[in-house]
Amino acid sequence: MIKYLSVIYFLFSSILFSDTTIVALNQVHHSFGGLGNNRTTTSEIQFPNSSTDYSSITMRVNLECPTGGCDPWDRKAKISVYHIDQWIEIGRYVTPYGVECGWEIDVTDYRSLLQGAVILKSFIDTWVQPGWLVSIEFDFVEGQSEYPFTIVRNLWNYDRLVYGDPTIPVDISTIQEYLPNDTEEAYIRITTTGHGQGNTENAAEFSDKRHDILINGEVSHVHNFWRPDCEFNDCSPQNGTWQYDRAGFCPGDKVDAQNLSILDFSLPGNTVEFDYVLEDYFNQCSPNNPSCVNGVTCTSCAYNNTGHTEPFYYIGSQLIIHTTNKHSNADVYLSISDQDTSISSVDIYLENYVSVYGVSFKLDLSLLEIQGDGNLSFEDGVSGRAEESNWTVSTNAEGLIVALAQGTGEPIQPGEGILTRIQLNLENVSIVSGFLKIIDVEASGYFGSQLSFETGEPTIFELLRTNEELITPTKITLHNAYPNPFNPFTTISYD
C-alpha cells in the first residue's frame, strides 16, 4: 500500500511541479530603417503563477540573421521586465559582428519578477535595416531552490553616463536600502560596460578602469569589470575587431553581471548606504575641452560616427536579497496583521526599504458582514512606528486613513513593524465577519516623491461583540442526548 501511495504522490508532484519552458519571443525582428524603428519590442508573457517551486530559471537568447544578413556591427542589447512601475534589467549582451549566436543567462535571482503576467522588453541598439531576429525562451527547472524567496531592488541604472567631461559632471546618487531581519544573503548585482573610442586612453570601450563601491562610506569593493578574454569567445569567428579586450564586454557574448556580497559590511535589520565612485579621468579629446588642439592633443577634438565617439558607461545594477520568508519588491508594503479577536482593533503592518514621509490608504469594508443596529467606524491610530516618529494618524467614517509627519515629526526610517493600531467603534454592533483589505494607497518620499507600493492579501476578520444584553438567552430548550450504547445517560451540570 505504501508503495502505491508513493507512486501516486510522485505522479501528482510531477504534474504540479514539472519542468516548464516559456517562449517569450520567436524570431522577432529588431531593426531600424525602412521597416520603421523596431529596435525595441515589448510583449506580455505568461509565466508560471508561482516560481518558488523551481530550482533554477535560465533565459536562452538566440540571434539569427534576417533576409539580407545580420547587422554588421556590434551593438549593445538588454532584456528587461516591468515590475511595480519600473523596468528591471535581467540580462545584457553585445551582438556579434554580422554572424548568428546565442547564449544562456541564469536569471534565477529574478524569480520574484518572473511569475504571472509580465511585460518583457527586448532592446538592441541597432541603426540599420537588417538588424536581427531575436528569440528568447525561459527554462524553469523544478526542484527545491536554495533561496526560494528573493527581493530585487533597483540601484544605479544609467543608459549613458558620460565619462571624463567636466562640463557634464558625473552625478551617481547615494542610495539607502533596508535589509530585512530574515535576510540570509545579500549582494549588489552590477553590470557595467564602457563605450566610446578615440579619446584619451581610448576610453571608455578600450580603457581598463577600476571603480569603487562604498558601503556605509567605506570602500567595500573595487569594481574590476575588464574583459581580458575576448579572443576566446565561443561566438567565433566573427567579422570586425571582436578579438580585442574591452571594458565589461566582448562582441558576440553575454555580459556577465558581478555579484558583490554586502553582509560582511552590514547586518540584517539595518539600513545600508551605497555609493558608486568612478575612477578619476579627464578626456582631453573632448570637444568641450578648450585646450584640445586638433592633431596635437588628439587626432581630432570633434566627435564623429567613426573613430572618435563620446566615452560613456552603460550601468545596470540591483540589490539582491535572499530571505527566509516572502517579501515585497516595492518601496512600501502595507498589510493587516493577524487579528487578535479579544480586542476591537486592527494593526497595520509597514515594511519599507526607503524613508517614508507620508502615507494614506483605505480600509475596504465592502467584504465585511456587519450585524446589529449600529455602524462600524474607526478612531485615530495610536502607537507603532508612526507614533515613535511623532506622526499623526487620522481616520474618517469611510475608512480613509492618513498618516503624516507633523511639527517635529521625522520620516519613518527604513524598517519593518507595526505602523499603527486602529481602534474600532462597535456601538450596537454584534458580529463583524468577512474580509478586510487595504486599498487606494498613496505613499510619499522625500519632497513628495511617489513611492512604489504593494499590499497584503485580504485578511479574514471575525469579531464577536459581547455584552450582557446580547448573551442573555430568552428561551431554553433541552433535547434528548444522541444514543450511546456504552453510556446511555447524560449529565449536565449547572451552577
Where are each of the predicted segments found?
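Hydrophobic h-region of N-terminal signal peptides that target proteins for export
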Residues: 6-18
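A generic beta-sheet turn/junction motif
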Residues: 181, 352-354, 485-487
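Extracellular/secretory-pathway and virion-surface proteins
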Residues: 19-328
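Acidic, low-complexity intrinsically disordered segments
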Residues: 327-471, 475-477
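Aromatic/hydrophobic beta-strand junction motif of beta-rich domains
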Residues: 59-61, 190, 348-350, 490-495
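Positively charged n-region of N-terminal signal peptides that target proteins for export
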Residues: 1-5
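Generic structural detector for well-ordered beta-strands
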Residues: 46, 139, 176-178, 261, ...
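Short loop/turn motifs at secondary-structure boundaries
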Residues: 470-495
